[in-house]
Amino acid sequence: MFIHWGLYSIPARGEWVRSTEEMPEEEYLPFMKEFDARDYNPKQWAKEAKAAGMKYVVLTAKHHDGFCLFDSKYTDYKVTNAGRDLIKEYVEALREEGLKVGLYFTLLDWHHPDYPHYGDRIHPMRNHPECSNENRDFSRYIEYMYNQVEEVCTNYGKIDIMWFDFSYDDMRGEKWGATRLIDMVRRLQPGIIIDNRLEVSGEGRGSLYDCNPTPYHGDFVSPEQIIPPEGICDKEGNPMVWEACFTMNNNWGYCANDHYYKPASMLIKKLVECVSKGGNMLLNVGPDAKGNIPQQSMEILHTIGAWMKKNSSS
C-alpha cells in the first residue's frame, strides 16, 4: 500500500496543488495550523493493508511541499500541531501487523529557501521573476535534505524500503549528492531496499537497465501508472526487479472532487499482470485531512482482500 498524506489533504485538490495552482507560500502555510491528524489511526491502516493481502506499506514522510510528518530538528515545518510524531506511530503499527516498513522521501522541497524557485519547471514560483535564485545556495539545501534523511534512517528502527522521489531535467544523480546520500542510508539501514529515482522519474529505468550501474542506482525500477508490456529486463536480457505504482482514482493525495475510481476488478487484473511479469504492485490511497481513508478506497481494498484470500497462493 502506498499512502500519500500531508498538508495538501486540506485544500483537497491533490498533492501537487501548490505547483499546479502556482500557490504562494503565504497562502499554503496556514494549512499547517489546521493539520491536526484528528482521526489518524495507523493501526487501522495497517490492518486494512494486511487484510487486502499487502506485505508492505510506503507512507510519505515528506512530499514536495516540504512538510514533514516526522519530528525534525532541522525545521519547524512539521507536524507539531498534531502533537504527535506520525511516522513513529506508523512504523510501530506496521510492525504489530508483521508488515514491512516503507518510507517515501522526496528529493524536492518547495518550502526550503535554497531550493530553486524561478525557472524550475515544477516549482510553484517558477513563473515569478521576483523569486530569483540569485541568493540561493543549493549546497545548503542538499545538506538539509541529507540531515533529514539521516534522521528518518536513525530514529525509527529498521526501515525496509526507502522510496525516493524523483529526478528530472538536470536535477538527478550527483546534483542530489546521490552517492553520499545512498551510502549513508545503507550504512544506517543495512538490508534496506531503495528505488531508482535518484537517477530517474517514473518513466525511466536507470543505469541498471543499461548494465552500467552508478553508485546510486537503487535496487528496483519504479514505473508509475503503467505496466511494462513484457516485464522489465536489462539490455542484456536479464530480468530486473520492479514495482509498478498506481492510484485508485486520478490523484495520489486526497482530492475531494475526484470520483473517477478504477473498478476493483481492473485493479485486480493489474495486480495479476504485474505478478505474472515478475513485478510488484504498489496501490495508493490518499487519506483526507483528518486521516480517514475515503470510503470508495476502503470498498476497493475490501474487494481486493476478499479476492486475495481465495487466490493469493496461486
Predicted segments, located by residue:
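Mature catalytic domains of secreted/periplasmic carbohydrate-active enzymes
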Residues: 2-314
